[in-house]
Amino acid sequence: MSNDNQNKTPDTVPTLSDEHEPVSRRTFLGTAALLGLSGAGLATGLAACKDGGKTASHGAAGSAEVLPGQLDTYYGLWSGGHSGEVRVMGMPSGREIKRIQVFNAPDAMSGWGITNESKKILGTRPDGSLKYNTGDTHHVHGSYKDGTYDGKYFWTNDKVHGRIARVRGELMECDKITELPNVQGFHGIFPDKRDPVDPKINYTTRVFCGAEFHIPLPNDGSNMGDDSKYQALFSCVDAETMEVRWQCKIDGNMDLVASSFDGKLAASNQYNTENGMMYANMMSAERDSCVFFNIERIEKAVKAGKVTKIPGSNVPVVDGTKAANKDPKTALTCYVPVPKNPHGVNASPDGKYFICAGKLSPTATVIDLAKVLDWFDGKHKDPRDTVVAEPEIGLGPLHTAFDGRGNAYTTLFLDSQIVKWNVDAAIKAFKGDKNAKVVLDRIDNGDGGVYSKKN
C-alpha cells in the first residue's frame, strides 16, 4: 500500500518549512489520490500524494509520526457504529481529522439536525421533529471510475433504521439520506463499478444494499406466524438521485455485499437459507449460500413490468427466490452453496473471484465469476460448480482483503488472527495438489500481543 520512496527513512528529521506549509481543507482534497483499502469492509481510503509520504524520523515510531503541516500517507473513512457518524482518520498517524455527522441528531456542536437544511436531509415528522435520532453505521464504501475510487461520493448504512446515507467527497459532509422500504437490519452495502451493458458508463451509477433480517412481506402483522412469508429484499439505489430503483426478494437472510468489476454481477453472502425463525433452525444446514444477482436481467425484468409492489411502497420488486429461478438461462439469481453462515464477501482486485468467508466454518470459499456467468448461460447445472477453492484457514473467518500480488488476508474472529493465504495455491490444492502451500502467515493478537506465525 506504499511505494519504495514511502518506505525509506530520511537521514535527518525534516522541519516545518516552506516545503511543509499548513495544509488547507481545499489543498488536502486537491492532493488526495484515491486508493481502495479493502480491509474489514469498514473503511474507504484516500492516499495523499504530497512529498511521496515522507517519514518523519528513524525507527518504527518515527515512521508513524506526521509532523504538523504534513499530510498522512493515507486517509481513511471509517464507520462510527452507534455514534451514527463517519470518521476521517489519517494513516499512519492515527489522527482523527473529522467526524462527519450522519444519522445521530440533533448535534449541538455542528448544528446537525437543528438547521433547516440538515433537518431536510434527515427527514422529519409532520410536527417538524426529526423522524429518527439514532443510527448505526457499519460500512463505508466509495464511488468508482475506471475500476478505482474517484472520491466523488461515499455511502454508509444505518443498520438500525434501514437507511443509506451519502457523503460528498469534496465537502466531506452528508448530503442525502434515503430510507429503504420494507428493509430491516440493512448491513451490506457496495456501489457498482460500471454499467453491465454500456461500456461508456465506466463509473458508479448504482449502490446495492442487502437486508440482513428477513421479515414477513407485507410486514403488516397479518402473516407473522407463516414462515413461508418471510423474505429479505436486495435494493438498488440510484447513486445520483438516491432513489430506490428496484428491489429483489430472495430466500433467507443477507449479510454483506460485493460487486464485480465488469458491472454484470452483485452478490451477498447469506445465512439462514433454512428460513428458520429460531437459532437452532437458522444454523442447522452445513451450507448456506452466496447469492448472485444478474443486474442486466433484473433491470430488463423491471423495464418489462415483470414486478410486484409491496403495499405502502412504489418500488418495483422482482422475484429472486429459488422457486422462481430454476432455469439458469432465465434466472435473475444464482444461489451458490457455501459453508456455513458466511459473513463477508469480497472481490479480488483482478476481477476474477469473490471470496466468501465461512464464519461458522473454518473455510473461505473462492467463487469464479466467469463460471457464475457461465451458469447463467446454462453451461453449468449445479451452482456449486462455480466454486474453485475452499481452503481451511482458521476459526471464524469474516472479511478478506488483498495485496494485489495474489495473496488474500482474512480476519478470524474466534482465533483473533489475520491469516495470509495465496488464492492460486488454494485453487491448486482444491484440484488435488498436495504440495500447494495455501496458508503463508498468521498475525495473532489474541492476548494483546502481535506475533507472526509463518507456516
Predicted segment positions?
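N-terminal secretory signal peptides
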Residues: 1-27, 34-40
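Predominantly soluble domains enriched in secretory-pathway, periplasmic, or organellar proteins
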Residues: 32, 41, 50-455
